[in-house]
């Protein structure tokens, strides 16, 4: 088995202590992911290193960090793809969140913003299958047995959100305005808006989007969409909200 000796530079912070970087050298398989390197540091060198991990296949979002300054999921990022073979591979916590310890951040703000839209992160748009799917693909099933909701592709793209916080970390506006609803929060508002025609509900949601810390604070950098590991396209959702708000404004100006 081909092995790599990788110097891993980890951001360290404990409450009451000054932040610093510690570098550890770990030997890992050439096909290993960054989370495997962090695991090796914890197992071999220092069990005080704090980090989150879960599924190991990009479905839970808990491990999200910055790798060489770029927001990524270390569970699906191979070391060989991000390490130059010489300099230490740097791992740091996400930006725009309070740091709890080392690579662990407090993501409470992310969920608070998403809850502003009463957004339940449940994949309601998944295909309903009245039987257990084992080794065959959904695409191979009889279409008559698969019930897909209207506009399935649009809904499923948003509901692939794994609440990792990467979009919030990548967003330049979040660094300047801590009250900004953020890409995840505004994407949730957009999705909730698309699910309702109730006038009161629509006014509430668009009022949030049109507020001081809503869509107009976005700098249209599209960093959130670029960084999103699940192709949710939060920037596209923000632009869609802007278009609806502008259309409503023109409608009112025309007296309709």
Put a short name on every predicted segment.
Residues 3-24:
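Eukaryote-biased recognition of intrinsically disordered, low-complexity regulatory segments
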Residues 48-54:
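A short, aromatic/hydrophobic, helix- or strand-capping loop or linear motif
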Residues 32-47, 92-256:
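Ferredoxin-type iron-sulfur electron-transfer modules in oxidoreductases and energy-metabolism complexes
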Residues 70-91:
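Glycine-rich phosphate/adenylate-binding loop and adjacent beta-alpha elements
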Residues 63, 82-85, 226:
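Extracellular/mature segments of secreted proteins
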Residues 21-33:
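Short, contiguous acidic and Ser/Thr-rich linear segments
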Residues 55-64:
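Short, structured protein-protein interaction patches enriched in aromatics and acidic/basic residues
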């Amino acid at each position: 088995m081909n092995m790599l000796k990788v110097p891993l530079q980890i951001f360290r912070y404990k409450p009451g202590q000054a932040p610093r970087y510690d570098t550890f050298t770990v030997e890992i398989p050439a096909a290993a992911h960054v989370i495997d390197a962090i695991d090796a540091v914890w197992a071999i060198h220092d069990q005080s290193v704090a980090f989150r991990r879960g599924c190991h296949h990009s479905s839970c979002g808990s491990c999200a960090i910055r790798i060489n300054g770029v927001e990524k999921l270390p569970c699906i990022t191979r070391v060989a793809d991000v390490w130059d073979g010489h300099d230490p591979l740097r791992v740091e916590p996400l930006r725009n969140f309070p740091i709890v310890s080392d690579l662990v951040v407090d993501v409470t703000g992310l969920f608070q913003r998403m809850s502003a839209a009463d957004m339940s992160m449940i994949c309601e748009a998944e295909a309903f299958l009245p039987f257990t799917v084992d080794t065959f693909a959904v695409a191979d099933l009889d279409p008559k047995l698969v019930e897909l909701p209207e506009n399935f592709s649009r809904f499923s793209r948003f509901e692939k959100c794994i609440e990792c916080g990467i979009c919030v970390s990548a967003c330049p506006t979040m660094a300047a305005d801590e009250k900004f609803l953020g890409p995840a929060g505004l994407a949730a508002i957009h999705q909730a808006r698309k699910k309702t025609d109730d006038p009161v509900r629509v006014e509430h949601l668009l009022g949030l989007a049109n507020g001081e810390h809503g869509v107009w604070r976005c700098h249209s950098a599209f960093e959130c969409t670029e960084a999103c590991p699940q192709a949710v396209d939060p920037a596209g959702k923000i632009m869609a909200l802007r278009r609806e708000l502008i259309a409503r404004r023109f409608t009112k100006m025309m007296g309709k």
